[in-house]
Curated annotation (Swiss-Prot):
Pfam families: MinE. Prevents the cell division inhibition by proteins MinC and MinD at internal division sites while permitting inhibition at polar sites. This ensures cell division at the proper site by restricting the formation of a division septum at the midpoint of the long axis of the cell. The keyword Cell division applies. InterPro entries: MinE, MinE_sf. The keyword tRNA-binding does not apply. Belongs to the MinE family. This is Cell division topological specificity factor. NCBIfam families: minE (TIGR01215), PRK00296.1 (NF001422), PRK13989.1 (NF010595). It comes from Bordetella avium (strain 197N).
Length: 90
């Protein structure tokens, strides 16, 4: 009988289903708390490190912003690039 129940799947108790649903709701609410996620400062630091390999920039010249609108999230990254020496002399 256990093999048959394995194939057909066991029906979960209503308590375990309710617990799973509450965990999903809590995780969703926790992820929406605050204006900016925890990873934004680290993302900004990593962007500075990568871009600094190729171009000399000031860490303050990179701005990372997350905007939420209903179900849409927009990650905006603004990087102020220094003028090249040829452009600066013109």
């Amino acid at each position: 009988m256990s093999f048959l129940s394995f194939l057909l799947g066991q029906k979960k108790s209503s308590a375990s289903v309710a617990k799973e649903r509450l965990q999903i709701i809590l995780a969703h609410e926790r992820s929406g708390r605050g204006d900016s996620p925890d990873y934004l400062p680290q993302l900004q630091q990593e962007l500075v490190a990568v871009i600094s390999k190729y171009v000399k920039i000031n860490p303050d010249d990179i701005k990372v912003h997350l905007e939420r609108q209903d179900t849409l999230e927009v990650l905006e990254v603004k990087i102020e690039m220094p003028q090249s020496e040829t452009q600066a002399s013109v």
